[in-house]
Amino acid sequence: MAPLTRRLPLLVAMTLVGGEMAAQGGPDAWRPQTVPLFGASYSPDIGLLLGVGVVHTRYGFRALPPSTQLLAEAAYATGANTYRIDVAGEFRRPLLPTILYVEMRASGLEFTRFYGVGNTTVGSQPDSAYRVRQTQLLVAPRVAIPLTSRLRFTVGPLLKYAHTPGDPGTVLATTGPYYGAGDFGQVGVRAGLELDTRDHTAAPARGVHLSMVGQGYPAVWDAVHPFGSVSAEASTYLSAGDPPSATLALRAGGAAVSGTVPFQELVYVGGGTTVRGYAEQRFAGRRGAYGNVELRLLAGRLPFGDVGIFGLADVGRVWIPAESSDRWHAAAGGGLWLAWQHRRVNTLSIAAARSPERTAIYVRIGFMF
């Protein structure tokens, strides 16, 4: 399973602006709109991630949601010293009620660390020993078939290409060779099922989010044997008060791979999307699991927005056949959040997570989940 993506949350959240303007009505509300986007986030291994983009929205005849949305964004990470470029499209009109999505990406941010394979790998060497300079290219069209208003099935082909140099002195170079290093291309198919009843995506207070994704790759291009992966994730949100004064957020997820898998497609746990307080891609295995809990409290309502605090606890691990380990890697911490102009879609969160390996700071739009 490839590492979870790191799209700039601010750029994604701001695509809602066009729909909100149309909902307000007015003579120009339904005209095509092009909106500039700006975003930033911070995590220890990526550094300061700065992004710019643009979203173009077109509507049917006085109808929501938009018939077409086109998004282009580019981001640069100061810590990883690399970039990410995304171009995406959402097309509703040609295939109603089916939705066509097209995603293309060129990125050096998808895979930045490698510590070896297993649940007990050590991280005591200098940071440079674990760095990976991998560039990934992705082309991924898919169709989404609504089964209900909140449940949808997606399916489509995948084309991936990765270039990974084996820099001297790194774990990747000294403990290899690893299948998938160098230049590696793969072609496959992805299918997913998603249930989403959340009231907001950036800062949910109520609802559930369930997703299951399977990927399969035949022995085509550089893949010498077929391989595949399956992953699942579930989150739920329980709140008191309206607007919420306290929210308990829970999430659990896991993944497994089968077949002869290139090293970048293993299951990875650690970092800002799974277990905070650990480095990105800290632990690699053929199976993995993680869990997260956050308690988010409203501290006060100020003229410019709502402010609050939250506590967090993360846990996760991986499994490989040749290793017998019963250790779960855990981290705990807390942080502050601000909902600008009292709107949850404008939520900024700052989190500090402490693990046995380090204390890490994360700044992002919205919450981790």
What is each stretch, according to the model?
Residues 1-9:
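Bacterial N-terminal signal peptides that target proteins for export
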Residues 25-28, 36-40, 86-90, 105-109, ...:
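C-terminal outer-membrane beta-barrel translocator/porin domains of Gram-negative envelope proteins
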Residues 293, 314, 336, 350, ...:
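Hydrophobic, well-ordered secondary-structure elements that form the walls
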Residues 324-336:
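A short alpha/beta connector and helix-capping loop motif
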Residues 25-185, 284-285, 345-349, 353-369:
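Gram-negative/organellar outer-membrane beta-barrel architecture
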Residues 300, 315-320, 339-343, 355-358:
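Short Gly/Pro-enriched loop/turn and capping motifs at secondary-structure junctions
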Residues 10-16:
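Gram-negative bacterial Sec-dependent N-terminal signal peptides
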Residues 18-20:
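N-terminal signal peptide c-region/cleavage motif recognized by signal peptidases
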